[in-house]
């Protein structure tokens, strides 16, 4: 039996939310097309999957949920679209996510979750309590 993986810093969803807020306020750049990496960094967890859609497809069903308005702070939201899909982090404001490339390309921003679909035509899949095989502390 494998050992349950948790993030190495013991961070909570609020810590991930704050990490993204700081990235936004500092004008962090160089995140274009790096949604999965940015979310991993916010949670301080290692790389595992090559894209957001692969991460979603490898997340066990018991960690997947569909109502975005019930998402706790810090969970990861996923969309299907393009070659790699998209992932973002739930902010402390219900329905709003921290994301890369929206509303401004190559930066971290906070938008209403439907903004990903509106901007790119991506299909909302749901949110998870696990990322890259690591249980999120939410």
Protein language model annotation of sequence segments:
Residues 1-51, 57-60:
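N-terminal capping segments
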Residues 3-27, 90-138:
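Aromatic- and glycine-rich peptidoglycan recognition patches
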Residues 48-113:
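...with weaker cross-activation on analogous glycine-rich loops/strands in unrelated enzymes
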